[in-house]
């Protein structure tokens, strides 16, 4: 028997991440990874014949038809002239490299935009207590990547450049992507992202590109907490909330085990707090910080629109998704590449923890 691995077998032996941009209750009614439906979408896109797909996924004809209908109903698959196409952005390793290459002409102008507004950015930072208590360097990944380019900027990009609503899928509006994952300890394509755990009046947030492979307060589970503190944990979120309340309260005596735990999950470094703590009023100033570069960034995208659309129209994405959906996922590659350049230029100081934990108090 040949040792050659069929293409469809290679797909099922590759790791993928499902990414989504949504708000409120705008999300799919199904988890496509649970039923291996992401493999079906990738194989259809790779022009693998139906019989080979059935064989590889070990489905009957009835099961395959049911799964196809599920994806059609969900708006993640579409049919045109008897052929099926994914209706979300599937990004293979090869396409990821192309998307990074596509960023190149925009990187230097973006670094210049940030430099142009750097004094204004620092002035605004000085209005926020946590930036006075911690050095800007300590918070630089969150500030220059998260706030300036990623979650602090993306609404501006949608509203003022794309000027369109998110795609409507089964009465829900959201962006959706399946991304090939090459590195075990890093998120797909090394893309930076934001994650938060809402505990009522406290939000624990985490920014970085190794959020799910590092020890942090969001991913800490029941077993880890019980093993570390040697006590039963009945309600994980309530326990985390109490840990954060002790961290926030300046008059609480912190014992050695708790202090070491704060170090372990990235709240402390070298015995000192290193976690930004934002109050509700600070969020308005964070918006102002993001807005410093907004206009110039939108102009840059408008000036490069034909360049970006040429790639889009020449790719398979043109028959699968809108330019707007293509752009928003490309934008993630773009701000990640800008972030990596800012790290190289020592504007962003890389932390030992890889990610930046921060807290928001309502």
Task: List each language-model region with its residue ranges.
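N-terminal helix-turn-helix DNA-binding core of bacterial DNA-binding proteins
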Residues: 36-59
């Amino acid at each position: 028997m040949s040792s050659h691995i069929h293409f469809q077998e290679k797909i099922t032996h590759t790791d993928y991440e499902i990414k989504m941009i949504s708000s409120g209750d705008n999300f799919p009614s199904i988890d496509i990874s649970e039923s291996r439906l992401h493999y079906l979408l990738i194989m259809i896109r790779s022009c693998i014949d139906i019989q080979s797909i059935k064989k590889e996924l070990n489905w009957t004809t009835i099961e395959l038809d049911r799964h196809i209908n599920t994806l059609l109903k969900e708006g993640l698959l579409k049919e045109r002239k008897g052929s099926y196409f994914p209706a979300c952005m599937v990004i293979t390793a090869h396409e990821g490299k192309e998307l990074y290459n596509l960023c190149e002409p925009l990187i230097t102008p973006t670094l210049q935009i940030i430099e142009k507004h750097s004094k204004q950015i620092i002035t605004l930072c000085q209005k926020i207590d946590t930036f006075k208590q911690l050095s800007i360097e300590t918070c630089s990944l969150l500030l220059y990547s998260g706030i300036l380019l990623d979650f602090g900027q993306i609404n501006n990009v949608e509203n003022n450049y794309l000027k369109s609503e998110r795609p409507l899928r089964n009465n829900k509006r959201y962006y959706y992507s399946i991304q090939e994952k090459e590195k075990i300890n890093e998120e797909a394509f090394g893309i930076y992202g934001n994650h938060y755990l809402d505990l009522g009046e406290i939000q624990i947030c985490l920014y970085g590109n190794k959020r799910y492979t590092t020890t942090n307060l969001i991913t800490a589970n029941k077993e880890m907490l019980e093993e570390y503190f040697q006590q039963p944990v009945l309600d994980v979120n309530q326990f985390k909330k109490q840990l954060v309340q002790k961290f926030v309260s300046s008059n609480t005596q912190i014992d050695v085990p708790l202090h070491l735990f704060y170090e372990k999950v990235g709240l402390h470094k070298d015995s000192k707090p290193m976690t930004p703590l934002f109050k509700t009023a600070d969020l308005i100033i964070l918006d102002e910080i993001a807005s410093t570069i907004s206009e110039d960034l939108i102009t840059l995208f408008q000036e490069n629109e034909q360049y970006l659309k040429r790639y889009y129209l020449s790719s398979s994405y043109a028959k699968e998704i809108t330019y707007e959906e293509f752009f928003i996922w490309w934008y993630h590659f773009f701000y990640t590449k800008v972030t990596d350049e800012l790290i190289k230029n020592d504007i962003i100081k890389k932390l030992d923890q890889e990610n930046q934990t921060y807290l928001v108090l309502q």
